[in-house]
């Protein structure tokens, strides 16, 4: 599962060992301080679904090229667990595949024409 390996790399040996051995739960504030989470949502429960869907929409069609977002996620998830030179090779491979996509052509055309891109995921 990788929990011990990942947590140790993220928060350090001492804190990871303490948490896993004692079963200590981490507060949202501590998780944020250790960079395990990026944000703490503070709205009320009735607005949660709407706020999450609004936030997620920035990562989906037509607002973002989904292949690019997927490749960024893949590189960021895989990269830290492989040697640096392999991470660079993975990044080059993923970028090369994107440059041949319809979304890349659309992104370049939109930039040149000074308009908002309309990505399709192709």
Cite the ranges covered by each PLM segment.
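Hydrophobic alpha-helical segments typical of transmembrane helices
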Residues: 3-6, 15, 68-71, 91-94, ...
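Well-ordered beta-strand positions
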Residues: 18, 22-24, 30, 39
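Conserved N-box asparagine in the HATPase_c
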Residues: 114
